[in-house]
């Protein structure tokens, strides 16, 4: 059993391991999402960000080197929950704009988690005097924010398409916002 973190240095290392695991899971989830996406722009965004995420894993390995610790992950329960939710949603929704809208929403949930974690790690790295690590983490943070903005733009278009599909398909929405027969 690992000892509980007691210092900011310990918290930084434990969070870094958590994010390392999460980022590797993200690469797999993005590849799976790219295969599942029907909307071409969304598929391309997933493929591009999967490549970026692979580079981010390499960047995290550099951060481990900078702090003199082995690059190893620890199970990230948040990422496991987010990917499990994505899997469940993929099973629950049919193909088409609604499924793509759900994929985009799941991907954004991952991006928001990563933005929060990278922002924290970047700040802690600066406070701990790991300036080179802070620069690497800042670079990744900016990529995550850019990916989130792109997903937002794509999601707006997909959501409109999904709404149009609902209107054309003769389905209506109940007061709770869900489709009713």
Model-identified regions with their sequence ranges:
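Amphipathic alpha-helical hairpins
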Residues: 1-181
């Amino acid at each position: 059993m690992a000892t509980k973190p007691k210092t900011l240095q310990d918290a930084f290392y434990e969070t870094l391991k958590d994010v390392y695991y999460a980022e590797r899971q993200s690469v797999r989830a993005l590849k799976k999402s790219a295969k599942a996406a029907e909307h071409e722009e969304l598929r391309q965004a997933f493929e591009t960000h999967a490549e970026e995420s692979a580079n981010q894993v390499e960047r995290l390995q550099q951060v481990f080197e900078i702090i003199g610790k082995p690059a190893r992950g620890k199970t990230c329960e948040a990422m496991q929950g987010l990917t499990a939710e994505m899997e469940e949603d993929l099973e629950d929704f049919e193909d088409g704009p609604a499924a793509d809208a759900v994929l985009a929403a799941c991907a954004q949930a991952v991006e928001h988690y990563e933005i929060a974690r990278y922002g924290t790690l970047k700040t802690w790295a600066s406070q701990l005097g790991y300036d080179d690590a802070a620069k690497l983490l800042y670079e990744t943070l900016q990529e995550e924010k850019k990916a989130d903005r792109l997903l937002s733009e794509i999601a707006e278009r997909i959501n409109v398409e999904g709404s149009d599909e609902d209107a054309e398909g003769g389905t209506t929405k109940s007061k709770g916002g869900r489709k009713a027969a």
